[in-house]
Amino acid sequence: MTQPKRIISNPCLQLKTLASELAECLRSLLIHGGYTINEDDIYISIIYKFHDFKNWKQTDSLYSEKGLETDEVVNNPKTTFSATLNSKNGIIFYNSKQEAFDKGEYIPDNCDKYDSNGKLLGSILCYRIICKKNAIDYITAIISITTYDKTLVSKKAPKSVIDNVKYNIEKHILSAFEKRISIELCLLYLSELNIRKKEMKLVSKSHKKISLKEQEH
C-alpha cells in the first residue's frame, strides 16, 4: 500500500514570506491621492510566546538588524508592544511615532530618524493575535508594523482619514493575514513541543544511565 506523502513544513520561512506579502498589501492600500510609500519602507516583525514556554521570541524578519532586541521590547512597559498586549481592542496605531513617544508608548531604536526639530519620523502599528482553546491562550503574538521615514498616512491627512486607514488595515488586511499567521504559529508551536519532547527523552535516558552506573559501583 502506498504511504501518504510526508508534509514538509517550514513555518519560520512561511512567516517571513507572510511578512513580505503583508508589507506589499499595505503599500498598495496606502497609495492615496498621489501619496505613496515603498514596500521597503515598511518594517514588519512578529514577536510570539507559546503556552508553557518561558521566553518571548521573534520570527525571522526581513530586516533583522532593525528594531530593539526582543527582551527590550517585551520587558519595557513603555513600548507599543506592551501597550498592545494589554489593550482592550488588541490594536494600536500611531501615524506619528512622536505622539506614541509623548504618550509613553514607544521607545526609539537606533534606526529611528528625527526631523530638524528633533521629532521622531515614521509610524507604528501593533496588532495582537491570540490562539486559544478551552480558555487557555496557547499562542500570543504581536505583529509590529513600523516605518522609519514616511508615515503610513500623509501627515496632512485629517484624523478621519487616519481612522479610516486604521479600520481598513485591521478589517481588510490584518484579519486576513491573521488566519495564515496563526496556522504557521501553530505549526511552529507543535514543532517546538516535539523538540522539547525529544530533549526530555534524552535527559531521561541520560539519568537512567547514570543511575545504573551508580548501582554497579
Residue ranges: model-predicted function:
Residues 1-61, 185-217:
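Intrinsically disordered, low-complexity terminal regulatory regions
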Residues 11-31, 77, 159-179:
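Well-ordered, non-membrane alpha-helical segments in soluble/globular domains
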Residues 34, 114-116, 134:
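Beta-strand elements of modular eukaryotic interaction domains
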Residues 48-50, 131-133, 146-149:
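Short, flexible loop/turn elements at secondary-structure junctions
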Residues 48-120:
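Regulatory sensory and allosteric helical modules in signal-transduction proteins
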Residues 52-57, 132-138:
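Short, solvent-exposed loop/turn segments that connect beta-strands within catalytic domains
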Residues 122-132:
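A short, aliphatic-rich beta-strand micro-motif
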Residues 136-217:
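Juxtadomain coupling helices with adjacent low-complexity linkers
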